[in-house]
Structure formats: structure tokens, C-alpha cells
Amino acid sequence: MVYSYTEKKRIRKDFGTRPQVLDIPYLLSIQLDSFEKFIEQDPEGQYGLEAAFRSVFPIQSYNGNSELQYVSYRLGEPVFDVKECQIRGVTYSKPLRVKLRLVIFDKDAPAGTVKDIKEQEVYMGEIPLMTENGTFVINGTERVIVSQLHRSPGVFFDSDKGKTHSSGKVLYNARIIPYRGSWLDFEFDPKDNLYVRIDRRRKLPASIILRALGKTSAEILDIFFEKVNFEVKDQTLMMELVPERLRGETATFDIEADGKVYVEKGRRVTARHIRQLEKDGVNFIEVPVEYIVGKVSAKDYVNEATGELIITANQEISLEALANLSQAGYKKLEVLFTNDLDHGPFMSETLRVDSTTDRISALVEIYRMMRPGEPPTKEAAESLFESLFFSAERYDLSTVGRMKFNSSIGREDAEEQGTLDEVDIIEVMKKLISIRNGKGEVDDIDHLGNRRIRSVGEMAENQFRVGLVRVERAVKERLSLGDLDNVMPQDLINAKPISAAVKEFFGSSQLSQFMDQNNPLSEVTHKRRISALGPGGLTRERAGFEVRDVHVTHYGRLCPIETPEGPNIGLINSLSAFARCNEYGFLETPYRRVVNGVVTDEVDYLSAIEEGQFVIAQANAKLTEEGGFADELVTARQKGESGLHPREHVDYMDVATNQVVSIAASLIPFLEHDDANRALMGANMQRQAVPTLRSEKPLVGTGIERNVAVDSGVTAVAKRGGVIQSVDASRIVVKVNEEELIPGEAGIDIYNLTKYTRSNQNTCINQRPCVMPGEPVARGDVLADGPSTDLGELALGQNMRIAFMPWNGYNFEDSILVSERVVQDDRFTTIHIQELSCVARDTKLGAEEITADIPNVGEAALSKLDESGIVYIGAEVKGGDILVGKVTPKGETQLTPEEKLLRAIFGEKASDVKDTSLRVPNSVAGTVIDVQVFTRDGVEKDKRALEIEQMQLKEAKKDLTEEFQILEGGLLARVRSVLLAGGYTEAKLGSIERKKWLEQTLENEELQNQLEQLAEQYDELKADFDKKFEAKRRKITQGDDLAPGVLKIVKVYLAVKRRIQPGDKMAGRHGNKGVISKINPVEDMPYDENGQPVDIVLNPLGVPSRMNIGQILEVHLGLAAKGIGDKINQMIKEQQELAKLREFLQKVYDLGDTRQRVDISELSDEDVRTLAHNLRAGLPVATPVFDGAPESSIKAMLELADLPASGQLTLFDGRTGDAFERPVTVGYMYMLKLNHLVDDKMHARSTGSYSLVTQQPLGGKAQFGGQRFGEMEVWALEAYGAAYTLQEMLTVKSDDVNGRTKMYKNIVDGNHAMEPGMPESFNVLLKEIRSLGINIELEDE
């Protein structure tokens, strides 16, 4: 296979056996595509800003004399780029300008005559922009908008599963959920009447809604029931017979026709009887007159002579009524067909409980329910009902909702219609009744066909629409005020409500979250997170088990493993590796199509609904050479159930083994051997790994490390192929290949690297180049490594030599024993960057000042500040040191006569100000790596600010000049080639100044044209450079837009180096976490026969009960990988010839049954040398999830590395030199240092702040709080009878205010007595009892 330039530097041996059909898609596409859809101009107006504008505009005035129409919109250019926004603390956004047209109609002329048209572009606030990595910069911090999983709009049929009523009767209900608008619920009550609710209010009989639609009782019965006709013939009552309806009934009379008795009285009618009746074609049978009594009439029967009603629709028929009918001359009678089995009398019963009789009374009833207490008028009632479900402004099912609705009730037409109509409501009621009758199934609301994803774009669009609707009201008011002759669109629109709605969404919505930026993986997973919480979603408290559980439709869509532990479990999920959203927002997953029993490489994306119809084989099904299934019976899924299916029945096959799990879970090698609970912890803990000082790739990986590193955007990736022209720590310059050039550009790509920047989690973001000048690179190659990446692969931790054995109790209960060598080699040293800021405000007493002249502070404390009072860059500071000197004016105090005298003598004025300097927090010590000063417009900049400004200008100038020189060089090189082609010699060119080359004239017209073109480009380049520099200069020198009352802000960045120490939390990738208990000297650690000590000792008892065996396999494979690295190292040291090295490498890569084909002979000698050099530390291997290295391969690899096949070595005790009594499992495990550092947690309280009401000490490190002495601790002291200790705890150590101060005084005086008083919380209790109206006083006897 062809390796890219960076890949062949270190080829990972792959143990996977399944061929890769589909590469993992771009990991951030769910965010980027959604936002792209939001801001791109969509001519159809289906989604995005365009859709929002079209749904609100045109806005008409109330009187219809004028309207404001929307024409188009455009987004301007952002003022600052992403980095500048982060530094300045502003939002990265584009201004939105909308072209609107105000049309005024002529009142006097016929309708629609236009009197005046004005068009204008109006500013409508700022729209935050997504960065290329899928984040938003809001007020200078990077945020992510998490996608939401919510119930899809449409209609859902459900039941209460027998929980509502005490009898355990199952009550069915239907709910129509629109995208926006009122919910409509239909439900049965225990008496089997059908009711309707609107927006979950009081229930009404369901027939009311049909009456409100203008239906009469007879029409309603006609819709919901089949009819039975009775006829009077020759004094006998005949019944029309549909034999099928008799099934299961017991005959109450002989069923006979033409003298033949088919069913005797008292017998049950069976299928055989029915077949006979059908065969003989019996259509009418004679029935006794009593049979009709109690049946229900289907329509009104009127006596035509007198005009009186004999029987109304839905009335039970009596013998008397029957006699009246025959007297009035009716020969035929229609009754409703009902039975107890599958034609229940539900609607007929419901009509009986319905008090309304006509449309108006039904509308009034609905009005009373929606607006209780308001007097209903006919117009109000009609317009309310009309606007509830039938007005496009108030109600919208959305495309998705309509699609789901139609597929549920089986409707073909009305595809574009967002509102409901009569047919919809009737069909839903019909389906609900048929489900109650036992036909059809209820829906499963946790099925992913009924839950859809709302991503950034859609949520932003909804917020934007909310803002527009607020504006719409104001515009309507203004349009109706009249006098529009000199009004422009701009005067009508106030952009505040729009920008407020957008700002609120991006700044404080529950789904707009502070990005988790611990490492590249945590960034990627945060952007791929799917939450069921948030506005319009669930709440933690109300979500039950079913919602949180893994559903069969999660397969390949949502990860069953990666979800938080704790109250959010199952509500926050992660997207599976290959999943994507379709146009409706449903999750799809790819499958390989099987055609005529042969698995093809064609891939179809199926949603959860489509997937139900197919039989889908697993990715590890055995295939023949031709691509057919090797086994007769194949393990496959159908409708979510796994089972064995004949190979001819299989329609699809999974594309990859890690299709089921998320990216974080796919990074765990041997995941298939881990218990699910531990795998969950492993996936979650990888996200908390802190980037180490030197990243080290995992020896045992899964092969997708490269995808994560590249897609996360922390590395610098080549946009186009070319040759590296120059590299230094902060930038890489690439000369682009000829074939990838855009005509007329200079063909130079410049990559500026990020150096030592603070992340959201205070870890350090730093990019290091991993290429050398002159190296060829292709598009997509990694040029520079970011945090936690190594040669373009994700590298979250370090490979540590591990032994599984107990060691003097230091690894009791998951503790970890670490060798001192790990600390010496800085294996787990991390850099943390903190931002400390100092704000100078304008106070009532005068402005605060940033200065080095601070009262009552010695020289030593000021030694690290410059003359402006700001710390130097590079200063090493510790807790309590001053970083920025600041003084605040304080109010005039009354002076004693003595002080006045001293003032008069010494002129001491310093006491007017107090010292409010920014100091280093107590527990922190580090190095100042950067200082930034922001000065308000119009405030004079201090010396330091000017210095920083000069430095920034110099940097910018240097950057741009270098860029210009490189581009100029490229352009002049092309000029040179043109001139040489035109007959100039090298010597002649050398004698002319380079700038003058462009002014030469050539005989050849074509070449002359080219030269002139190049000259034009040169001028453009120069002008462009000047413009860029001017813009940059303006940005750097202009004042900053600071909050009101703020004059200056100084931000100081401290870099803190944290070595690993006891109390830090570490973990492997299999959920095996622990805390470091001791750092042991190297000489005391167990060592092997070669004298090599282990780095870490883990407790073997942590494995069996937790069932994460993956870690053991990883350790064995790690040992083999390292052993092979050692052999290669040995060969290099012995300077063996390349042929032997090639042969050995080929042997290694061919080991095992693998899909990977590495042909070492294709690599050049130089490539082989580089490869061997990079493999000396160990051969990196990949064991893909569910397709990992088998035991045989691990053993073969151990043998190839001349190691025991058991993976166990004899170890010797470092203290005594004696061998341990049995061989020990030793190997290499990839260990992570998690962001739970003891430095951030350790804390001790001295006298500190107290809570205001209870006067008890606060809790927590942030508040400098104490430990709570709670109820149970009090019991413990009571049990010991330690009365005085208890008294001390409850009084002077807690909330006895006078006792505390006395105690302090006593200690100072050396008198160690204690006088407890009344605890403040007792007073609080008294006050609370008094607030209940009971007075309690302590009476002194």
C-alpha cells in the first residue's frame, strides 16, 4: 500500500483481519455541516437564516396599507480573527445585513396599487461564527454547542401499560406533536370513552373536536362505524348478513335461510359455519324482533307527516320506537355494527357523554377550556380554534413531522403541508380506535426512528426566529401608526431583540457548553456528544429507565459504552464512529450491500426505520474469496434481534467491527475482552488525560489514533502537497507543487504554529514541527504535532514497564507504586498555564492606578516588577508574590491630632490609597510566560503597554515581510524563467537589479504578456501586503473595547510545571484507575534477569473481579512490541547490513493473519533507516476493536522477540536481590495521568470566611472552607462521651461568634481556656420558629 510521507516514518503493524471498506468519516462533520446549512444562502428557503426570514416576512400592517418585505441577506467580514477574539475576550462573529423593502399601498386606489417602494440594507446584529474546528468563540472562550436528541414531531400512539387505573386496564392514547404549536392528545378513559386534550389541559370528549370541525352526530357515526341493515318483509324482520361478522358469536336463535339451519340456537359460530354461509351465498336471514332491541341507530329518522323525530342518531332502539317507525312507513333501518371483540362502541359512547349539540357549542366549550374565565363570543371562539391547529403562523409540523405523520397514518397526499386538517384528525382517531380494538401496535418512543437530532444550525435558526418574531410585533405597531412617507426600513427595525436572542442562546443555553479541552480526544468527543437534556428535552429527575437504556436501534448510531456515570447516565450519549445525520435529523449508519449472496463494497446508509426491514450480518462473518458467506447459517440481526439466518436471506453486512462504538471506545485495544462497565470508565477517563511534556505514541493502539489527531484540528496539516522550504519553532513554510497551484498565485503556504497557549482546562497547547526542510509532503500530511499527538497519532499517555504483583501493601485497593525513574525522566510531567487578571476601574473616589509605587511594601516584593508595576516575562514567582501593582483610592478618614501633626511635618500622603495588587494564589508557583495589557480607548497607555505594542508590531511586520519575501521570491523565480526563455542569459540577469526584472521588454509577444501579467501580480502583492500590514497595525494600536467603568486590564499567564507525586490519579485505558501511593527509589524496584527495573507495580487483585482482561493482553503484546524494538536497536548498534534489517522488518510485518500488506522492499534505504530508528523504542501495533490480535499472534510475536511465550519473567526484589517465588507478568501498558491532581485538591483551612446567615465556615477549596462536622460525626463523639470535644466542635470551632473572637484573644494571651456561648445557628432556629408565630425566649431563673 502507499504510505504518506509522515506515515512511513513509523508504520504501525496492524493485526486486523477484516478489510477496510469505508474510512471513518470526518469526525466533526455533524457540527460543521449543520452550521454550514444555517448560514449558507439557500435559494429554496428550506433551512437556515433564509427560512427564518421567509417565515416571518413579509410583515403587514394591521390595516393592510403597507408591508415590509424581505429581499436578501449578506454576512460581512469578521473584525478580528479567532486568535485575536480569544485574546481580547470578544465574540468571533460576522455582522448580518439584511436588504428589506418597504412597500406602501395607495389607500384610495383599488387594492394592491403601490404608492411607494423603499429598499434599504439594515444591520441586524452579529451572528457568531463557527471556527474550522467546530467551536464558537463567545466572549473569548471556546464553546461547543452539543446536539440534542429530542422526540421527533409527528403522531405517537402509546399506552399507559396499565399503570394509571387500579384495575390494571391498559389505556391507549395518541399524541400529535408539532415542531412548534399546541400538542393534541387523544386518550381513552377506564370507561372506554375517547377524550381529547389540548396542551395537556382539562380533557373534553373527543367528539367535541369533530363537532367543531362541523360534523353532525350522524356524520361522526358514519365515519367510525360499519352499518347493519334491517328490513321489514311480510311481517318478519330480516337482517342483512355479512357472515364474517358472526365469527365467535353465540347464536341466540337458529340461523337459517331457505329452510336450512346453519347454526342451532346456543351454538358458537365457527369458521366452518361461516364458510358454509358464504358458499351458499346467504345475504339475508330472519331474526326475532327482540334481536334489534338495544342496537344503536345510525341516523335520524323523522316522521315525514308530522315532522317529529322518531329516533335520533346514536339512540338505542326499543320495541316502541320500532312500532313507531313501521307506522311512519319506514321499511329499512340502519344500526351500528358493534361487538365486544374487535368493533367496540367507543365513539357512540363518547357522543353520549358529550354535552354539545352543534358546532358553536363545541367551539365555545374548547374556548372555555383554553381561556377559562373569559366570556366567549362566537368570533373569539372561532378564531381561537382556527389558530390552534390550522394556521401556519401558530402551528408547524415541519417537513420531518409531516413525513412521520403521513407514514404513521398511511396518508399519501399533503406532503408540504405544515398544519393539520380534518382528514389528519379523523385518521388519528380511527387508528387509535383500531389499536384499542386490537389491530395495530403502539409506538416505541425510544426507537431512534422516533427521536431525532437537533444540531447547532437548527437550534440557532430557532433562536433567530424567536428574535425575529419579537421584532415583528414592534414593526407591525410602527407600520400601523401611519405617516410612512419619510420612514425607511432602518427606522422600523430594532436589532436589539434579535442579537439578544442569539447572544442568549450561544452564551447561556444549557446546550452551549464550555469546551472540554483537556486533550484532542476530549475536544472531539465533546463535539460529537448527543444530549437528551436541554430546552424541549428531558430533565434528569423525570427520565426513567427506558429512556436511558440501550435500545436495539442504537446499533451503529449511538455508542452503548460511552456515557457518563452518575445522574446523567444514558441521557448523554456519543455518536458512533460511522454514524451521520440524514436530512430529516435521524441517525443513519452505513452497511455493505449484499447482492445475490455476494457482499459488495457498495455502502448504503440506513436510518433506524429503514433498517427494520432487512437482515444484517455482522462485520466478522466469515467470507469466501469471492465475497460470499462461508457458513450456511450466518449470525445476523433482524428487527434488532440477533439470530442465525440462512445466508440467502442476508441483505446487508456491517462495514467495520468498530461500527457499534464511539471514537473514545474504539481507542481501547482489546475492548472485546473488557467488561462493559469498565470499558465505560476507560472511554471516559481517556478524555481526562493531561497532555504530557513529551507525547509518546501508544505501543498497543487500535489504528484510529491518526484519525482523531488529524480531525481534532490540534495538529498542523498540509492543505496542499509540496516541499518544506523552511521550518522553525513558530512557523512552517511549504512551497506548493506545480500541479496544485491556482494560476496566478505565488504558490507558498505558511503555517503559523500555536506556542504555549492556555486551554480551557488550563492545560498547555503547544505545536512542534515534525518535518525537516527539503522533505516532500503530500496533502493531508501532518506537519506539526499538537498537544498529546506524536507524529500525527493521538498520544494521551506514556508506555510504562509494568509488573502485576503485590509490593508491601503499597498497591492495596488499586494504589499504584511508581519508580523514581518515572519522575526523573519527566515521563508524566505536565505543564499547566493559568491566567490571572487585574482590572483597574474607575471608582467613586477616583481611578485605580496600576503602578510600582505601592504603600507599605518592601523593595524585595517589588523586585520582579518593571517601572509600570507589571511583572517581567520569565520571572519565577511563588504564592503571595505581587504580579501587578495596583492602588485604589480610599475615603478620607478622620485623623487624630497626632496624625495631623505627623502629616504636616512629613507630608505623608500615601495613606490615601490602599494596596489592591494582583498576587499569586497561595498554592501556585510558576513562571510568567506572557503579559497582556488592554487599555481603554482614550486612556493613555503606560510604558509596558507601549512596549508590548511595539513588540507585536515588530512580530506582525516580520511575519508579513517574511511572507511577502517568500511570495516575492516565488514570483521572481517565475519572472526569471520567463526572461531566460526570452533570450536573457544568467550573467545579464545577474547584472540587473531583481526589482527591475519586471520592467524589461521582450521580443516574443506571448512571453511579454506573461511578464506584464507577472508585473501586475507583483503590484497587487505589494498593495495587498501594505493593506494587510495597515489593518494589522490598526488592530494592534487601537484602544480596546472594555466593560463600562474599566480603564485597564492586565492579564498575566503563569506556566506551572507539575511533576507526578503521591496522590495523583492515574489510569490505563481499560477502566483500571488508581492513586499513586509511593514513589520508590529505582534501586528498590523489582528487576528482571537483565537488571532492568519495572516502572510501575500494579495489584493483580484489581483484575479478576473487575473482568477487564484487556489490560493483561495489552501488557503481553506491549512486551512483545518492546522486545522487537530492542532487537532492532541491537541490530542498529551492531551496524548489521540493511538487507538483514529489511528481512527482519518484513518478517515482523508479515506476522499473523493480517489485512495489512507492508512491502519493505518498496522503501528506499533512507526510509528503512528512518523507520528502523523510529521503531527502536518499540514496534507500534494496532489491534482494532472486536478484530484484535488473537492469542496465537501474541505468542508468535513474543517468540520472535526471544521472550517467553507465557509473557511472564522471573523478577528479583530490589532490596534483597532475591528472586520472587514465581514468575510475574511483566510488560508495557499505556498509562494516562488524569486531570485530578493532588495539588488542585489538597487544602487546609485556617481562620477564613463564614456563611452570612448561619455564621458557619464555608465548604470547599475555592471558598477556603473547612470540613463539615456532620450529623453522623456528632453521633460518633456522643458515643465516645467526648463531651468537651463535642462542645468545642459545635461552638467555638463553628458558629459561636463571640466565643471565636474570645478564643483568638485567649490564645494570643497564652490563656488556653475556652468559653463557649450561644451558637448562631440556634438563633437562626429561634427566628425560624418565631416566623411560624411561636415565641421562644430563654428566661434566666
UniProtKB/Swiss-Prot annotation:
Return the GO cellular component terms, semicolon-separated: DNA-directed RNA polymerase complex
Annotated InterPro entries: DNA-dir_RNA_pol_bsu_ext_1_sf, DNA-dir_RNA_pol_bsu_external_1, DNA-dir_RNA_pol_su2, DNA-dir_RNAP_su2_dom, DNA-dir_RNAP_su2_hyb_sf, RNA_pol_bsu_bac, RNA_pol_bsu_CS, RNA_pol_bsu_protrusion
One biological process term from GO is: DNA-templated transcription
- Key words, A-Z: DNA-directed RNA polymerase, Nucleotidyltransferase, Transcription, Transferase
Which Pfam families does the annotation name?
RNA_pol_Rpb2_1, RNA_pol_Rpb2_2, RNA_pol_Rpb2_3, RNA_pol_Rpb2_45, RNA_pol_Rpb2_6, RNA_pol_Rpb2_7
Enzyme kind, highest EC tier: transferase
Query: According to the UniProt entry, what is the EC number of this protein?
Result: 2.7.7.6
What GO terms are given for molecular function? DNA binding; DNA-directed RNA polymerase activity; ribonucleoside binding
User: Where are the coiled-coil regions?
Assistant: none
Catalysis: reaction(s): RNA(n) + a ribonucleoside 5'-triphosphate = RNA(n+1) + diphosphate
- Which CDD domains does its entry note? RNA_pol_B_RPB2
Is Hydrolase among this UniProt entry's keywords?
no
Its biological purpose = DNA-dependent RNA polymerase catalyzes the transcription of DNA into RNA using the four ribonucleoside triphosphates as substrates.
Binding partners and assembly: The RNAP catalytic core consists of 2 alpha, 1 beta, 1 beta' and 1 omega subunit. When a sigma factor is associated with the core the holoenzyme is formed, which can initiate transcription.
The Swiss-Prot or TrEMBL record describes its family as follows: Belongs to the RNA polymerase beta chain family.
Q: Which HAMAP family does the UniProt entry name for this protein?
A: RNApol_bact_RpoB
This protein is called what? DNA-directed RNA polymerase subunit beta
Q: Which organism is it from?
A: Vibrio cholerae serotype O1 (strain ATCC 39315 / El Tor Inaba N16961)
